[in-house]
A protein has these predicted regions:
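Polar-ligand-bearing catalytic/cofactor-coordination segments
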Residues: 1-231, 254-342, 356-364
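Flexible internal linker/loop segments at domain or repeat junctions
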Residues: 222-241, 247
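Hydrophobic alpha-helical transmembrane segments of polytopic membrane proteins
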Residues: 241, 245-257
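Blade-level signature of beta-propeller repeat domains, shared across WD40, Kelch, NHL, RCC1
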Residues: 352-353
Length: 364
C-alpha cells in the first residue's frame, strides 16, 4: 500500500463514519434529546459544547492516523509527538470555537429575524471564511512568518512545516501565496508556478469562491427545511448540521468534477507562457511533495480527487487553452462548512490530522 492509498483509506473511513453517524442521529431522532427553543442559554451552550466534544473525540483516531502515524510509517516529514499533539490541540480548539460562535450567531439571528436572517448570517460567515482563509489558517496552525517574494511581485511566501502545504489564492484581492520551501524545490521554475497561480487569481478564483459559498449556503437552506431542522435552538441546528453533513458528502462527489477543469485551465495558461516541458517538470516536482501519486485509476480520480493526477495534467498541456473555469471550489467549500456544524471539513484524505491544511487545503 502506498502512502497516497493509505491516506485515501483513512479519508474514506473517516468520512464514511461521519455520514453513517449523521444518518443514525437523524433516524434515531437525536435532535429531540438536545435543548429546544425554550431552553436557557446555559443549557444551549452546554449542549453545543457536548456536540463539539463528540466531534473531537470521534475525529481523534483519524487525526492521529492522518497527521502522525502514517507520515512516520512512510518516512514523511512529521513533527515529534509532543509538537504534533500541541499543534493538533491548538487547531481543534480554534475550530471548535469558530464553529460554536457560528452556531450561536445563526441561532441569535434565527430568533431575532427568522430563517431568512439566519441564512443571511450563514452566507456572511461562509464568505468571511472564504476570503479570510489565510488569517484563519494562522489561528488554526502555527504557520511561520510570511514575506513578499522579492523576485515575484505580489507573491507571498509562507513558512510551513507540513510538506503538503501549498498556499493558494486568498483574500479580497486574490493574493497569491506559496510555501517558502518551493523556492528551493523549484529553483528557477518557481516562476512557472507563479504564472499558474496568477492565471487563477482573478476571475477563476472568485468564480470558485462564489460557487463554494453558493453550495454551502444552498445546502444549509435545504437542511433547515428538512425534518428536525430549524434555527431556534441547538437541537434544531444539530439536525441541520447532520443534514448538511450529508449535503457536504454529496459535494465531495460532485464538486471535484467542477474543480478539475480549473486545474487544467491553469496548466494550459502556464504552457502558453512557458515551454510545456518546464510546466510538466513543475507538476511532477510538486506531485512528489504531496502524495507522490503521478498516476491513478480513473474511478479513484473521478470520485476522490479534485486535482487530476500529474500524468493526466501533463497529457492535457497542449493548446487550445480552456476558457474560464472555477478554481479550487471543492476544497474551498470544506472550511466553509464550519459555518453550520459540517463534520467533513477536516476528515478528507488530504488534510486528516494536518492542522496546517484544515483551512488552506492542498491546491494545484
Amino acid at each position: 500500500v502506498t502512502y497516497a492509498r493509505a491516506r485515501l483509506l483513512v479519508g474514506i473511513t473517516g468520512v464514511g463514519i461521519w455520514v453513517v453517524a449523521a444518518v443514525a442521529f437523524l433516524a434515531a431522532d437525536g435532535p429531540s434529546v438536545l435543548p429546544g427553543p425554550d431552553a436557557t442559554f446555559s443549557d444551549q451552550a452546554a449542549a453545543l459544547a457536548a456536540v463539539l466534544g463528540v466531534y473531537v473525540l470521534v475525529s481523534l483516531p483519524f487525526d492521529a492516523l492522518g497527521g502522525y502515524i502514517l507520515p512516520r510509517r512512510f518516512g514523511r516529514s512529521c513533527p515529534d509527538r509532543d509538537a504534533y499533539v500541541l499543534g493538533w490541540a491548538r487547531g481543534v480548539l480554534v475550530q471548535a470555537i469558530a464553529m460554536a460562535l457560528a452556531v450561536l450567531a445563526v441561532v441569535a439571528a434565527g430568533r431575532a429575524g427568522g430563517t431568512g436572517a439566519a441564512i443571511a448570517v450563514v452566507a456572511a460567515i461562509a464568505m468571511l471564511i472564504g476570503v479570510a482563509r489565510m488569517p484563519i489558517a494562522r489561528m488554526v496552525a502555527d504557520l511561520g512568518p510570511s514575506r513578499v517574494d522579492p523576485a515575484h511581485a505580489g507573491v507571498v511566501l509562507v513558512d510551513a512545516t507540513d510538506p503538503g502545504f501549498t498556499g493558494g489564492v486568498a483574500g479580497l484581492g486574490g493574493r497569491v501565496m506559496m510555501p517558502s520551501s518551493w523556492t528551493q524545490a523549484l529553483g528557477q521554475d518557481l516562476e512557472v508556478e507563479v504564472a499558474r497561480r496568477r492565471a487563477v487569481a482573478g476571475a477563476p478564483y472568485w468564480l470558485g469562491l462564489l460557487l463554494a459559498a453558493a453550495w454551502t449556503v444552498g445546502g444549509v437552506a435545504i437542511a433547515i427545511a428538512l425534518p428536525g431542522g430549524g434555527v431556534q435552538s441547538v437541537g434544531q441546528v444539530a439536525a441541520v448540521g447532520a443534514w448538511f453533513t450529508l449535503w457536504s458528502f454529496l459535494g465531495l462527489l460532485v464538486l471535484p468534477s467542477v474543480s478539475r477543469p480549473g486545474v487544467m485551465a491553469a496548466d494550459a495558461a502556464a504552457a502558453v507562457a512557458y515551454p510545456a516541458d518546464r510546466v510538466a517538470a513543475v507538476i511532477r516536482v510538486l506531485d512528489g511533495l504531496q502524495d507522490d501519486e503521478p498516476e491513478r485509476p480513473d474511478v479513484v480520480e473521478v470520485v476522490f480527487h479534485p486535482i487530476p493526477s500529474a500524468d493526466r495534467r501533463i497529457a492535457r498541456l497542449d493548446p487550445p487553452c480552456p476558457g474560464l473555469r472555477p478554481w479550487h471550489a471543492a476544497r474551498m467549500a470544506l472550511p466553509m462548512s464550519w459555518c453550520m456544524l459540517g463534520l467533513l471539513g477536516r476528515a478528507v484524505h488530504c488534510n486528516a490530522g494536518r492542522p496546517e491544511l484544515w483551512v488552506l487545503l492542498p491546491a494545484d
